[in-house]
Amino acid sequence: WFKFNNDFLIDPNDATCFLSNALIPAMLLGEDIVVSPQYYVSQRFLKHITKIQEVFNFWNPIFKKINITATSKILNNDAAGCGSFFSGGVDGSYTLLKHKKEIEYLILINGFDFNMDTDSWQTMIARTKKTTTLTNKKLITVETNFKEFTSNFGLSRLSNYGGVLASISQLLNLKQCFISAGGTYDTLFASGVHPQLDYLWSTETCQIEHVGLEANRKDKIALIKNEPNVLANLWVCWEDPKVNCGKCSKCIRTFVSLLLCNIEEFPFQQPILMKDVSQIIVKGSEDLLYIEQFFFEAKNQN
């Protein structure tokens, strides 16, 4: 389920967003999907589902190709403006500044990375409102049970989060929606959010785009540095929605990127020391890519 703060006109007979949500769990289970004839889905999206399934199945055969039975329709309803998913982090802030002229809405989600309690959620909303005010954008807040929904099927968030971002874009009927890249062209890996996948979730009226692959962490912060108010409002922490803790791996990685951009003052709750950087534990290929990028950038800067 989804709960929005804005009054968007939603067609109760359009099941496109629910098909997006159900696709990857159904592939994991090997269960076909049948959409009741009283509902319809986007013809463009239905056509692309075969390709989405091919990509997921090629990456991991545990995701079986399934049959979809649904009435399709060429959507022609009026779409809203351009939106971008935003949690206050480096990737979303870079996209906001890079595409400032196009973006009209910033979309903040509770139940995606975290299930925030009321106080934490209100803190996140207040922080994001500072950014929307500074950049003259509108805020869309979304609450969802995505985290529990995905966990119920034993799915990792990485597998299904492209589907849920797509479903929100489709449900809001945004004309264009940006999903921010977490890596670069040379560091791509199999993930539910990927440039080979994201555009395939588009409908006739909603174009979904994967953006930001041209910039690594340091490049992104170098752009954000030019907007001191946006920089001061960054939130990167894995551990606490209310602060940047200064202890988790994301905070420490951000600290290194800030140093590489000659930024020494940043509001971490606990000051980060160079010894903390040396003690980073590499838990996977994504962590290793960040460390390699930092080493390369530091070496270039002597």
PLM regions: where:
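Extended acidic/polar, glycine-enriched regions
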Residues: 8, 14-23
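Nucleotide-activated chemistry modules centered on ATP-dependent adenylation/adenylyltransferase
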Residues: 21, 26-33, 39-85, 90-302
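Beta-strand-enriched, solvent-exposed domains that form extended recognition/catalytic surfaces
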Residues: 1-7
